[in-house]
Amino acid sequence: MDIAVWIVSGLLAVAYLAAGLMKTFIAKEKLVKNLPWTEDYSAGTVRFIGIAELLGAIGLIAPWLTGIAPILTPLAAVGLVIVQALAIRTHIRRHEQVIANIVLLVLALFVAATRFLQLAGTI
């Protein structure tokens, strides 16, 4: 189980690192072309989402890997579940596809549940 959760955590971290860097450092006007939902939000909100994704990506790996405050890893995963739940809401409202968001949500939920159970010593 530990190998599976590390693989999923790594894949999520890479995905959120890429998405977070893009939303944090690319101007909103350029993002609208590939991320049309950004036209519904201010540049500050898009940047905030990007920073949340960057912190989530780091939080999925660093605390558990270093053993420093490992509780932050499942909490980061829960934060990413919330990000995806809100993204799903936005995409449904805009009549856009949500499959990728659902997959990311389920994977983050898997990491959160597994890491919480590992901290509790039940698995």
Place the predicted regions along the sequence by residue:
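Membrane-interface extramembranous regions
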Residues: 1-123
